[in-house]
From Swiss-Prot:
Protein's name in the database: Putative pre-16S rRNA nuclease
Role this protein plays: Could be a nuclease involved in processing of the 5'-end of pre-16S rRNA.
Keywords, comma-separated and alphabetical: Cytoplasm, Hydrolase, Nuclease, Ribosome biogenesis
Family the UniProt entry places it in: Belongs to the YqgF nuclease family.
Length: 147
């Protein structure tokens, strides 16, 4: 069965690994299903952070934003959960782009063991978040196509 056109329209997504001191950013598209780490923003305040993000959005023109949803290993929320949700809501409010949430448990832990990743850990974490989003999107599209 062919998928309807709406289901195969390419998505350019920008993902964020939110932290109170640094925010990792990655970009990718649904055609390659791969993400590319862009940068880690070390912003002293939210004005600086959102100005940097605005520049990245202007450059890459994503039509979807993805934010990592941090929780404890058992899925329970912790102190960063509400902060990440607030950040995602601010992204949506400021830039009028849809925001998707992706479980980010273990993304940093997976990368911390890789010495090459440590220098830009947050941006690489955002890449994993983005690739997880594409994987989940693919799974959802395949499920809908089978219905």
């Amino acid at each position: 069965m062919l998928k309807p056109m709406a289901l195969i329209t390419p998505i350019t997504a920008m993902a964020f690994d939110y932290g109170t001191r640094r925010v990792g950013v990655a970009v990718g598209n649904s055609v390659t299903k791969a993400g590319e780490p862009l940068k880690t923003i070390a912003a002293p305040n939210s004005d600086t952070l959102f100005k940097d993000i605005e520049q990245l959005l202007a450059e890459w023109q994503p039509n979807q934003l993805v934010v990592g949803h941090p929780t404890h290993p058992d899925g329970a929320p912790h102190e960063m959960t509400a902060k990440a949700i607030r950040f995602g809501n601010q992204l949506h409010g400021r830039f009028q782009l849809p925001v998707a949430w992706v479980d980010e448990r273990y993304t940093s832990a997976v990368l911390e063991g890789d010495a090459q990743m440590r220098d830009n850990l947050d941006a690489h974490s955002a890449t994993l978040i983005l690739e997880q989003y594409f994987s989940e999107l693919d799974t959802n599209l395949n499920t809908k196509a089978a219905d």
